[in-house]
Design a protein with these regions (language model features):
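Internal/C-terminal transmembrane anchor helices
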Residues: 1-11
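Juxtamembrane/interface segments at transmembrane-helix termini
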Residues: 14-16
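Soluble catalytic domains of enzymes that build or remodel membrane lipids, polysaccharides, and related
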Residues: 18, 23-251
Length: 251
């Protein structure tokens, strides 16, 4: 048993680089390199030293943009503040956009917002940002808020000739993004079950619990997360970061 958990710990520590080519059916002024993250779960289990290694991984890619699909903070915000993790996030060299996850609501999301205001992370909570006048980035509030806006509300008035990227932490109801004309959605939350055999159960709970997916013109990636919840081990799953090469249709 000890050997299994030791092996699971080594699997967790080995962060997997996932290359992902996304070809959009819309013109893009130039290709963009994006690093996609989810489920950092910063706190007592994952501290500043580990976060620093992740920041180095991100910066080594020299991305144009970094997207974080929720669960930046795990439970208690206290260790995040005490260890000065905001300063570490500020070492990311590219612009960073993020949405909230369900863990941001544990103990009160207001404290998480306050922490993120100390960082360069631009939190999109039922709001839209324009990046380099090339594309839109929508960040949905988490399902933990039953009053969150619909995608039809969030996309109202957008120029549909531009690509629309969506950050939505929990990958439920993927048809909503397709119906709203989203071009690419990044989600997390599932950890793909984290350990065997829970991954087999999680695979049956979601239309896509991990990896690339497509519905019509809408493309998706559900990340198993770079971090972890609970113990630092994985069995049958991987801790990952996604390196997205985003390109557009020739105009």
């Amino acid at each position: 048993m000890i050997g299994i958990f030791a092996w699971g710990s080594s699997v967790y520590r080995a962060k997997v680089r996932v290359p992902l080519a996304i070809q959009l059916d819309k013109p893009l002024a130039r290709p963009l390199k994006i690093v996609g993250l989810s489920d950092l779960h910063l706190g007592y289990t994952i501290g500043r030293e580990e976060l620093s290694r992740w920041v180095d991984l991100v910066n080594s890619e020299r991305p144009d943009l970094v997207l974080i699909a929720g669960d930046i903070v795990d439970g208690d915000v206290r260790p995040v503040l005490e260890e000065g993790m905001a300063e570490e996030l500020n070492h990311i060299e590219a612009p960073v956009y993020a949405c909230l996850g369900n863990h941001e609501y544990l103990g009160g999301e207001a404290h998480r917002r306050q922490f993120l205001r100390q960082t360069k992370v631009q939190l999109l909570c039922d709001s839209v940002a324009t990046f380099a006048d090339q594309l839109y980035i929508i960040g949905r509030d988490d399902e933990s808020n039953p009053q969150r806006k619909s995608l039809s509300q969030l996309t109202a008035g957008l120029d549909r000739s531009k690509p629309i990227l969506l950050l939505d932490h929990q990958p439920h109801h993927l048809e909503q993004a397709q119906q709203a004309g989203i071009d690419f959605q990044l989600s997390g939350h599932t950890h793909r079950g984290q350990v065997f055999p829970i991954n087999l159960i999680v695979d049956r709970m979601y239309e896509r619990s991990h990896g690339y997916h497509r519905r019509g013109r809408t493309q998706y990636y559900v990340s198993s997360g770079i971090g972890i919840w609970g113990g630092k081990y994985r069995i049958g799953t991987q801790s990952e970061y996604v390196v997205i090469q985003l390109s557009g249709r020739a105009s």
